[in-house]
């Protein structure tokens, strides 16, 4: 989203990373008819957000001889797991591997993810901090990112205690799904939130340009 926002002229730059790997995946039923991405030809795929998810889907399917014209896209309005479990669609793009897989398992269905970064899509940081460079206080942001680093270290070193603290902030968090998702999210946290991988951001920006979602590529100094 940052690349799209920059292309639209929004005054934003990346200042840190919270989740350093993709969470998004293409989700199918483990025991369903889709064993490879080529099996999706002629099938229905659910999505929630037009644009980026279509580009991701196209990038994953095209190496397997499947074009977007070969599938039927259905907007399932963020009802990802129910759409696939009910048979409304054969797969969904935009499923978070730390949530939807657990949600399906709890409800008695096994899901399987095709991971974007293993299917030709450049890896990217899933969750980042952004700020307006004209208004940000550099010293305050440095302290904030340092606090994020210390918090992440504590979370990784103390997963049970950190879950108790996190779930204690809201009663609606205190359920099996969120506890499972918390555990699966732990290895995804950025241990060095201030670190910036220029190549990763440039690679994904090029992917977006080649997909037609942006027309020009920003200088790296305009990204972070």
Task: Show the residue positions of the predicted features.
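Short helix-capping segments at alpha-helix termini
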Residues: 63-68, 108-109, 172, 213
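Predominant activation on well-ordered alpha-helical scaffold segments within soluble catalytic domains
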Residues: 3, 58, 102, 149, ...
């Amino acid at each position: 989203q940052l690349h799209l926002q920059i292309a639209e002229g929004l005054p934003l730059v990346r200042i840190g990373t919270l989740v350093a790997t993709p969470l998004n995946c293409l989700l199918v039923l483990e025991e369903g008819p889709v064993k490879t991405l080529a099996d999706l030809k002629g099938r229905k795929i659910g999505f929630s957000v037009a644009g980026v998810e279509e580009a991701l889907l196209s990038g994953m399917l095209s190496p397997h001889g499947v074009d977007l014209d070969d599938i039927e896209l259905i907007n399932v309005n963020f009802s990802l797991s129910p759409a696939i479990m009910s048979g409304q669609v054969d797969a969904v793009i935009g499923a978070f591997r730390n949530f939807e897989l657990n949600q399906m398992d709890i409800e008695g269905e096994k899901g399987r993810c095709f991971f974007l970064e293993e299917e030709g899509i450049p890896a990217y940081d899933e969750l980042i901090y952004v700020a307006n460079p004209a208004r940000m206080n550099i010293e305050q942001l440095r302290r904030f990112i340092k606090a994020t680093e210390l918090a992440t270290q504590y979370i990784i070193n103390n997963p049970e205690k950190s879950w108790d603290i996190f779930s204690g902030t809201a009663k609606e968090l205190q359920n099996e799904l969120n506890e499972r998702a918390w555990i699966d999210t732990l290895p995804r946290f950025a241990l060095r939130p201030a670190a910036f991988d220029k190549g990763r951001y440039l690679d994904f920006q090029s992917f977006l340009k080649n997909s037609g979602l942006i027309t020009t590529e920003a200088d790296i100094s305009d990204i972070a």
